[in-house]
Amino acid sequence: MASQATTLRGYNIRKRDNVFEPKSSENLNSLNQSEEEGHIGRWPPLGYEAVSAEQKSAVQLRESQAGASISNNMNFKANDKSFSTSTAGRMSPDTNSLHHILPKNQVKNNGQTMDANCNNNVSNDANVPVCKNCLTSTTPLWRRDEHGAMLCNACGLFLKLHGKPRPISLKTDVIKSRNRKSNTNHAHNLDNFRNQTLIAELKGDCNIESSGRKANRVTSEDKKKKSSQLLMGTSSTAKISKKPKTESKERSDSHLSATKLEVLMSGDCSRPNLKPKLPKQDTAIYQEKLLTFPSYTDVKEYSNSAHQSAFIKERSQFNAASFPLNASHSVTSKTGADSPQLPHLSMLLGSLSSTSISNNGSEIVSNCNNGIASTAATLAPTSSRTTDSNPSEVPNQIRSTMSSPDIISAKRNDPAPLSFHMASINDMLETRDRAISNVKTETTPPHFIPFLQSSKAPCISKANSQSISNSVSSSDVSGRKFENHPAKDLGDQLSTKLHKEEEIIKLKTRINELELVTDLYRRHINELDGKCRALEERLQRTVKQEGNKGG
């Protein structure tokens, strides 16, 4: 601090104006005296300045003689009359002593106010500045207009921005301050938010780990309980052990229903991972569902045990000439857990192979390796999506049911037009030839009754994988000759029906096309008639005008 005083000893320090003026020899002597009297090392704090009475009087004399315009914090000029040499005489002898550390803005002397630069003396009672426009005396900053009139901060800013005086209606006694948020507070809030998010994430990770540990503990406890239940073999423990299985089944059923909904909405029938499921129920109830709802595509799931296999008797006559049998048809369907995608209707006639007839006198069962398709689910009229399934993928024994012949006859008697897709019909015709050739090569003709459901809607139903076995009594088997079985007649009848349906479809499409063409011709003829009439009217008008001119 002493070094600062010695280096700045030859300058009058003005912190406000950043002006360093050289001192006289008297001022240097007075400064040396003050240092000798115990003020060595003292320095005015920040915002203050050291001012002596002699310096103030000398500066005032110089400024009054030069007539310079002096401005203070209030930004206004002071006249030379206000600055006089009498101010030095008015000061009390107390101020002529050592350097006093005074505030930066004012020096109070006997009821008067003097600013730090000694630029102006203003009385608190008489010379209070007043705004010329709004007549206010409270403002944080005084301004002046282009003529030198004193204005408050608000009026001065309004005049500077708008170029006209501020209206008095905008005058307010309350000075409003700007609400500015500091950057430090904003950064602090951001840091707090980040810390909170990190803490929440850490807590979530801890909760996940704890839940995983709990799940592992629960699974281990469940395993122990299951083992104890198996050892004890009580009914109560058996009930408890069935709960997780039912929950897993419900979850898998919900997942399968969602995937089926997606398949039906998108029209995509080539999902190999889609496994149809149904809850366990009686065969009669399921048969009634199939009879009432022919588009029911789900296949009933059964176990492979022989005790659960049952025969369902139903009357089914595809045609009086093609089905002379009076025996009841029983359906045995056994679906494995890994049943692949369901084949299309075109696989109905081309997959008849590898049949076996049991001669034990009680029943005759024919198993189809490739599966026989029955139509159930509807497809879009404009799309002919066929699902080609490999014969090896289809299980040997597939359980399904036959639809009611009453529904078939009702749908055939319906006057609504039949609109099949041409590509699928061609596929069926090709597979029909294959089926006939396969039947001819076999020594004993099988008792297959492939079922073709012709619907009135513009669709071809998707096939459920199935194998149909005909249970015939021993008396009927003994009195019947297999050589007289109408398997060949069945193929011929199917081919004739397919040809007829195809011709009907072609004729109806041709009729629709001709109707559209006739409608177009009619419109064109009407347009030509209108043009002819307009031309005739114009001709008549021109003839009349020429006749009037000639007459």
From Swiss-Prot:
SUPFAM superfamilies linked: Glucocorticoid receptor-like (DNA-binding domain) (SSF57716)
SMART domains: ZnF_GATA
Subcellular location: Nucleus
GO biological process: maintenance of protein location in nucleus; negative regulation of transcription by RNA polymerase II; nitrogen catabolite repression of transcription; positive regulation of transcription by RNA polymerase II
Biased composition, class Basic and acidic residues, residue ranges: 244-254, 478-490
ZnF (GATA-type) intervals: 131-155
Location of the region described as Disordered in the Swiss-Prot/TrEMBL record: 17-43, 212-260, 379-400, 467-490
GO cellular component assignments: nucleus
PROSITE patterns for the chain: GATA_ZN_FINGER_1 (PS00344), GATA_ZN_FINGER_2 (PS50114)
Coiled-coil boundaries: none
Molecular function terms, GO-annotated: DNA-binding transcription factor activity, RNA polymerase II-specific; RNA polymerase II cis-regulatory region sequence-specific DNA binding; sequence-specific DNA binding; zinc ion binding
One Pfam family named in its UniProt record: GATA
Keyword Plastid: no
Keyword field: DNA-binding, Metal-binding, Nucleus, Transcription, Transcription regulation, Zinc, Zinc-finger
Polar residues composition bias: residue spans: 228-239, 388-400
UniProt key word Hydrolase: no
Family annotation (InterPro entries): Transcription_factor_GATA, Znf_GATA, Znf_NHR/GATA
Comp. bias intervals (Low complexity): 467-477
Note: Present with 319 molecules/cell in log phase SD medium.
Protein name (Swiss-Prot/TrEMBL): Protein GZF3
Species whose genome carries this gene: Saccharomyces cerevisiae (strain ATCC 204508 / S288c) (Baker's yeast)
Gene this chain is encoded by: GZF3
